[in-house]
């Protein structure tokens, strides 16, 4: 094969690889408080690899963006895979998980009984989750170890029990526990957030701008530390 032929073949190969990579995408879901609404919000970017049964997600506390001044802090994250509920208090079993290293929050993974989901979700049974504080249950939690407004954290979960579920089903099965919710939110100081409607375009623009700003700030901090 001539040089030109090899060059064209190489370019074609790169285009095929690039095209295949472009088809891989993560889902984004928007969480809002069941009782406090825009006082307690989060954006979750999630991705599921069905070949390895591995689920990864990054959650950002956007409460102070959707409601300036909000102090709502994420202290627990749980998933109840469909259908809602389970005969066992621990739901589906066989999952393992961990939080990516973080300087701002400290979540602990659990595949056991995470307790009830308050604020109107009594029928939910969490299959796995991440909690803060000594209680080890979803309804409790430690504000000091949680995710403050503007902060993000990443997690990974794997397990054969994911078999048969789609990325969309898993992403939408999230429950987020908020503590230190402003009383003006109307939920008596705490709340649980679930996936809701897509925010208005103006809100999405603000979220995107804020997340980009946070990323730039983090990169500047890393450069300074180096």
Where do the model's predicted regions map?
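Compositionally biased, low-complexity segments enriched in small residues
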Residues: 4, 19, 198-199, 205
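Bacterial N-terminal signal peptides
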Residues: 10-19
């Amino acid at each position: 094969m001539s040089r030109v032929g090899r060059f064209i073949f190489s370019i074609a190969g790169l285009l095929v690889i690039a095209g295949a990579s472009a088809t891989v995408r993560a889902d984004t879901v928007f969480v809002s408080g069941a009782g406090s609404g825009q006082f307690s919000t989060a954006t979750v970017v999630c991705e599921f690899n069905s070949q390895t049964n591995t689920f990864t997600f990054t959650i950002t506390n956007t409460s102070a963006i959707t409601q300036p001044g909000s102090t709502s802090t994420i202290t627990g994250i749980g998933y109840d895979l469909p259908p809602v509920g389970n005969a066992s208090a621990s739901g589906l079993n066989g999952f393992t998980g961990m939080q990516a290293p973080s300087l701002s929050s400290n979540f602990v993974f659990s595949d056991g009984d995470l307790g009830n989901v308050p604020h109107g979700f009594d029928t939910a049974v969490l299959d796995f989750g991440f909690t803060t504080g000594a209680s080890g249950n979803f309804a409790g939690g430690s504000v000091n170890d949680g995710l403050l407004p503007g902060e993000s954290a990443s997690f990974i979960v794997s397990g054969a029990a994911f078999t048969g579920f789609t990325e969309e089903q898993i992403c939408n099965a999230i429950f987020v526990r908020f503590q230190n919710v402003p009383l003006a939110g109307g939920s008596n100081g705490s709340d649980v957030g679930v996936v809701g409607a897509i925010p208005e375009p103006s809100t999405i623009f603000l979220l995107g701008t804020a997340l980009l700003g946070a990323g730039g700030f983090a990169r500047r901090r890393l450069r300074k530390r180096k």
